[in-house]
Amino acid sequence: MPREIITIQVGQCGNQIGMEFWKQLCLEHGIGKDGLLEDFATQGGDRKDVFFYQADDQHFIPRSLLIDLEPRVINGIQNSEYRNLYNHENIFVAEHGGGAGNNWASGYHQGEQFVDDIMDMVDREADGSDSLEGFVLCHSIAGGTGSGMGSYLLETLNDRYSKKLVQTYSVFPNQVETSDVVVQPYNSLLTLKRLTLNADCVVVLDNTALNRIAVERLHLSNPTFAQTNSLVSTVMSASTTTLRYPGYMNNDLVGLLASLIPTPRCHFLMTGYTPLTVERQVNMIRKTTVLDVMRRLLQTKNIMVSSYARTKEASQAKYISILNIIQGEVDPTQVHESLQRIRERKLVNFIYWAPASIQVALSRKSPYVQTTHRVSGLMLANHTSIRHLFSKCLGQYEKLRKKQAFLDNYRKFPMFADNDLSEFDESREIIESLVDEYKACESPDYIKWGMEDPGEANVVAALDSKLVV
């Protein structure tokens, strides 16, 4: 029985990457832009109903909610060639259409105001599912709507659907270029608190690394949002491929995540993908073997998180877990040989306190999408170097907070009224504790470290109850 997943796209960034994701899914399942199955899509063997449901007129409709506080991006989707794909009852745009002004507090406050309307849509989708497995949230952590309203929805989903999994695809801001959102460090910190406490799994999409990959690997001198979004949609579709083209393992979300996340707080995953191509670069052809793909996935330059730094401290960082999803016509014996070769050459540095093994899921490629390569691979990895990304967010926050800069923008809203800034302090403590925990994972006695925190047992129990299938 398929375990359905409801996708919630929040804010400008969330809706843009969500749109690219649905375009990719339509291509892979042979679904036309209007939601009707293409004449050639007769092979079957795929599970369309994990992400789509079929209407009475045979249209395939995404199990998706499109939410924004300003209309520009959603209007663009409604005027695009995919306008008939979505269920228009599942589109929410705030009446005043003024957005959240890149202010987390505004997005969160409006989340409270509109929660009944949005949760009605969520409940309707959930009631239409036979065996709902969980939710996927697409958003960014730096702006106002995706971060603030996304945070409120995470808390609400966690409360109302406590037994369902919540996975997020969270876009982290570019740390190299100067941002046009001056309060980005505040927004990021407040959102990170919710991602730590209210999500079961966060796939980190780091704009710094995505831009670097587009420049260095794809040779695009000035990558556009559309090009980096196409990288994101590639990762999103590849990470769900075992759910949609099921094999004998990893064919539901619980199965995917249980092996990657041994401890509840350390649930931030980084990704790598190979071979990468964009439309203007299809003429580059090379021989892809399983070993070649698996070796490339471990190379720093293919990893889509910039915290994977080339410093001495980063060399001590360790993998907590790795899952490689290999797509294509692959002989399982090749996989076994490749894993042996990687082990012999000590290409991977694992933690001391858990099994040091790379897990591999084999998946069929979509018969409807032609690619120039025979084998492709996605790596989902839980790696302790991700803490450097959080440390950067903390550092940027401290700079602003020291100067008391832009805090008046937040004091206008109930959570920060009467100069109550305790929410910032609490968020900072939680992220500092997260950084400490990832650092502690690198030592052999991490298990004892976990026992020092009396609240840890409760958190473990909460996650365990979700991972009982």
From Swiss-Prot:
Pfam name, any one: Tubulin
SMART domains: Tubulin, Tubulin_C
Superkingdom assignment: Eukaryota
Annotated GO biological process: cytoplasmic microtubule organization; meiotic spindle organization; microtubule nucleation; mitotic cell cycle; mitotic sister chromatid segregation; mitotic spindle organization
Signal peptide feature range: none
Keywords of the record: Cytoplasm, Cytoskeleton, GTP-binding, Microtubule, Nucleotide-binding
Major localisation: cytoplasm
GO molecular function annotation: GTP binding; microtubule nucleator activity
Subcellular localization(s) per the UniProt record: Cytoplasm, Cytoskeleton, Microtubule organizing center
Gene Ontology cellular-component annotations: cytoplasm; gamma-tubulin ring complex; microtubule; nucleus; spindle
Binding annotation for GTP: A142, G143, G144, T145, G146, S147, G148
Task of the protein: Tubulin is the major constituent of microtubules. The gamma chain is found at microtubule organizing centers (MTOC) such as the spindle poles, suggesting that it is involved in the minus-end nucleation of microtubule assembly.
Family: Belongs to the tubulin family.
Name the record gives this protein: Tubulin gamma-1 chain
Species name: Zea mays (Maize)
The encoding gene: TUBG1
